[in-house]
């Protein structure tokens, strides 16, 4: 379900602006839809190999029926869908072109989601990977909330008209720093 939500967010973002005619709109949906599918799948591979590398996600989901791992996998797809949505939504792009902008934003988003994962694990009194592997759904939901929240902050930072890379990185940096500052506060309030 998370994968399809991420896909809807990213592909649906093509239709948020004004119409450029039926043919151009369909071409945009096709190009960005294909790009979204590729980026979502790459994100899941990154999630498997880098972010949650302490256990085998496919084994946890398919063999062990670990709901918590499925929740985390879905939240990664939703967060990535939000990042791609923000990247596609804004008008204008740098000299490199719109596809390169989306790719740079996606890479930036993946780095931030990785850092979020590390910070979240540091601010908890337990190893989230261990508890997720053991099937603790509450830990998975808490972690997923953080990942999706940061993905939403990235989305809001990117979903504006492109002025310059400096302004974009400042917007993303400010929002992410605020998000990182609130992560421990949210953990404290919910615990």
Predicted segments with their positions:
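Membrane-interface segments at loop-to-transmembrane junctions
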Residues: 1-2, 57-73, 128-143
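A generic, lipid-embedded transmembrane alpha helix
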Residues: 2-16, 75-82, 144-156
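Membrane-water interface of transmembrane alpha-helices
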Residues: 34-53, 107-124, 181-191
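Transmembrane helix-loop junctions in multi-pass membrane proteins
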Residues: 11-24, 83-97, 122-128, 152-170
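Alpha-helical transmembrane segments
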Residues: 24-41, 94-112, 167-182
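Membrane-interface helix-loop-helix junctions at boundaries between adjacent transmembrane segments
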Residues: 20-39, 43-73, 89, 95-100
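Alpha-helical membrane-protein topology signature
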Residues: 45, 68, 138, 165-180, ...
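A contiguous, surface-oriented mixed alpha/beta subdomain in the mid-to-C-terminal portion of proteins
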Residues: 102-103, 107-119, 131-162, 166, ...
């Amino acid at each position: 379900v998370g994968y399809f939500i991420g896909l809807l967010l990213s592909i649906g973002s093509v239709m948020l602006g004004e119409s450029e005619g039926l043919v151009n709109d369909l071409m945009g949906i096709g190009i960005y839809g294909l790009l979204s599918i590729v980026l979502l799948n790459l994100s899941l591979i990154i999630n498997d190999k880098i972010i949650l590398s302490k256990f085998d996600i496919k084994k946890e989901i398919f063999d062990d029926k670990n709901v918590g791992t499925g929740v985390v996998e879905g939240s990664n797809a939703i967060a990535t869908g939000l990042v791609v949505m923000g990247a596609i939504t804004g008008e204008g792009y740098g000299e490199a072109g719109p596809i390169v902008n989306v790719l740079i934003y996606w890479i930036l988003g993946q780095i931030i989601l990785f850092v979020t994962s590390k910070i979240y694990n540091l601010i908890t009194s337990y190893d989230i990977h261990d508890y997720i592997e053991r099937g603790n759904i509450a830990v998975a939901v808490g972690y997923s909330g953080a990942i999706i929240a940061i993905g939403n902050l990235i989305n809001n930072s990117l979903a504006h008209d492109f002025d310059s890379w400096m302004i974009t990185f400042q917007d993303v940096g400010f929002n992410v720093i605020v998000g990182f500052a609130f992560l421990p506060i949210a953990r404290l309030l919910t615990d």
